[in-house]
From Swiss-Prot:
One Gene Ontology term, aspect cellular component: nucleolus
Entry-linked Pfam families: AATF-Che1 (PF13339), TRAUB (PF08164)
Protein name: Protein BFR2
Major place of residence: nucleus
Keyword Transport assigned: no
Source species of the chain: Mycosarcoma maydis
Record's keyword terms, sorted: Nucleus
Similarity annotation: Belongs to the AATF family.
């Protein structure tokens, strides 16, 4: 069946209709789109009926065409269904978009559209009329009046059209100005928005950078603090381990006692010479380490506050004494050692360097003590109205506390306390003396240095720090004995030999007993006699004469079976008393 041809009215309607074309791919004439509704409200069927209304067709032809259409239409069996909600919403939104004010046009008449052409033609007519007027200036008056009237009418019409055109142009200019101003406002708003967003991004980036720098600084500070604490703990452990050496040194006898022992032979003075050389080398190492640390600590400060190490150390560095062989050389060597020239030189260097570092040391102590001290506690104490807050030793600077402790006879009293040997051990007395520590408890000795008070304070501080660290890690409270053993043993614990796989009955636990001595269990295989023979033996032992025994044996032999003949023959062969063969 050929497709239906559209009329001129339907084609014109498609040009004036802004709605999209509804295309049905399953329609018989799918290659030609069908247009549903036009802008004027008429449909395709109405236009065709209007245009082809004069054509008359027979009823039979219509029926045949309908049957052919049903056969050719693949959707003939479909039921009529209303438009879905989705299509309605789509059409509604589309109509809303089309009805937007931006797409509205301006109504105008055909005269306004052709006003420009009419004005151009009218201007040419005016020129022609002027030329005619110049040619016919001597014409009749009636013609001039008619021409004047006609010109007036033309001028009125042209002026009215020109006013309408100007008004329309003014409206267009106003609309253009409004659109331009709105575009400018939108552009400025977008620019301000972009600028604000860029400013926010830059601000957030700067804040993130500052936070990152602060976080890195805090992390570095924490690492340095941890490193300092670890160094301090190692130094404290070294001091604790050196306490045993100091205790043994305090037990050395008086110089008058071991002078005779040292000068007796060269073999006795040789260890003293080696020990003195090693001590002097250790002193040089510690002194160089101290000067190095002072240089590193003052690297970031002003050079005026730096203290230089003594360049001329007057002590005898080259203490290299050979082991003497003769008695006179031994006495001279011991006299040189007992003069303490090398030790005095070392002490002078240490004391002079310490006195030079005292201002710097006091300044550093006060600075870091002020940073460590809690300012909140001081502010709270001041707010409570406590006038004696500054008099407390805790709230004072370390230099002030040291000065107050050493004021008056404080220094002499502390020095005298260190010259008393105080120890609870049994061997706390000096070698070569018979008195115990209880007898010499209050006796001062210039050759003794016992800082038990300071050592106890250091040990207590270390134990508290270790216990706090273990409790923070979840280990709970730790006894002092365990911590002391860890300090003395270097933190290594003795591992017991325990089989961990033998728990919960996974291995059989048993103990091997020792072998029995002088014990023999009964062996039944070695006994050849039966119960009758044993019973007969005991009857023989209990009988008073051999006749009774023979009579009893004769009766027993008669009562035995024939199967026991061999046994009875063996018994008869026994001439005398025989026990167990």
């Amino acid at each position: 069946m050929p497709p239906k041809t559209s009329s001129l009215a339907s084609l014109l309607g498609t040009l004036t209709n802004a709605a999209p074309v509804d295309f049905d791919p399953e329609a018989p004439d799918a290659d030609q789109p069908t247009f549903t509704t036009f802008a004027n409200g008429s449909d395709d069927a109405a236009s065709e009926s209007g245009s082809d209304g004069d054509e008359d067709e027979d009823g039979d032809d219509d029926d045949d065409k309908e049957e052919e259409e049903e056969l050719m239409n693949p959707r003939a069996h479909y039921a009529d269904v209303a438009t879905s909600d989705m299509r309605k919403r789509a059409a509604l939104s589309e109509s809303d978009k089309i009805n937007d004010p931006r797409y509205h046009g301006v109504k105008s008449s055909r005269a306004e559209l052709y006003a420009d052409d009419y004005n151009g033609e009218h201007a040419s007519d005016d020129d022609q009329d002027d030329q005619d007027d110049q040619e016919d200036e001597y014409g009749s008056d009636g013609d001039q009046d008619e021409d004047a009237d006609q010109d007036d009418e033309d001028m009125e019409v042209a002026s009215s059209k020109k006013d309408k055109k100007l008004r329309f142009a003014a409206d267009n200019d106003e609309s253009d100005d409004d659109s331009d101003s709105s575009q400018v406002n939108q552009t400025s708003a977008q620019a301000s928005t972009s600028n604000s967003i860029a400013a926010q991004i830059a601000q957030s980036a700067s804040q993130a950078k500052a936070l990152k720098a602060r976080r890195l600084e805090d992390a570095e500070k924490g690492r340095q603090v941890r490193k300092q604490i670890k160094t301090y703990e190692r130094t404290l452990e070294t001091r604790i381990k050196a306490q045993s050496v100091l205790r043994d040194i305090n037990r050395l006898p008086d110089p008058q006692v071991y002078q005779q022992a040292m000068t007796s032979s060269s073999t006795c003075i040789e260890p003293a010479i080696v020990l003195l050389e090693q001590l002097l080398e250790l002193s040089d190492t510690l002194f160089s380490l101290r000067t190095r640390l002072n240089t590193l600590s003052n690297s970031e400060e002003e050079e005026d506050g730096m203290v230089t190490a003594p360049s001329t150390r007057k002590r005898k560095r080259d203490f290299d004494v050979t082991v003497p062989e003769h008695q006179e050389e031994v006495e001279q060597t011991w006299t040189q050692i007992a003069s303490h020239d090398q030790i005095d030189a070392v002490l002078n260097d240490v004391v002079g360097y310490s006195c030079a570092l005292e201002p710097h040391r006091r300044r550093v102590l006060d600075k870091w003590s002020l940073k460590v001290t809690s300012a909140a506690a001081a502010a709270a104490a001041a707010s409570n109205g406590n006038r004696f807050t500054q008099l407390r030793a805790v709230n004072q600077a370390p230099s002030s506390q040291i000065d107050s402790a050493l004021a008056g006879d404080g220094l002499s009293r502390l020095v005298a306390r260190t010259r008393v040997l105080r120890s609870e051990s049994e061997g706390s007395f000096k070698l070569g003396s018979t008195s115990t520590s209880l007898d010499t408890e209050e006796k001062q000795d210039s050759e003794v240095f016992d800082d038990t008070d300071f050592y106890s304070t250091l040990l207590k501080e270390l134990i508290e720090r270790r216990s706090n660290g273990l409790s923070n890690q979840g280990g709970g409270t730790t006894s002092t004995a365990v911590l002391l053993s860890s300090l003395q043993g270097g933190g290594k614990k003795k591992k017991h030999n325990v089989d961990t796989k033998a728990s919960k009955g996974r291995k059989l636990r048993y103990e091997v007993n020792d072998k029995l001595v002088n014990f023999m269990p009964p062996i039944r295989d070695r006994i050849k006699w039966g119960p009758e023979q044993i019973e007969r033996l005991f009857r023989q032992l209990a009988s008073s004469s051999m006749g009774v025994v023979k009579h009893v044996e004769a009766q027993d032999m008669q009562s035995d079976d024939e199967g026991q003949g061999d046994d009875m023959a063996k018994d008869a062969q026994l001439a005398g008393l025989r026990v167990f063969g």
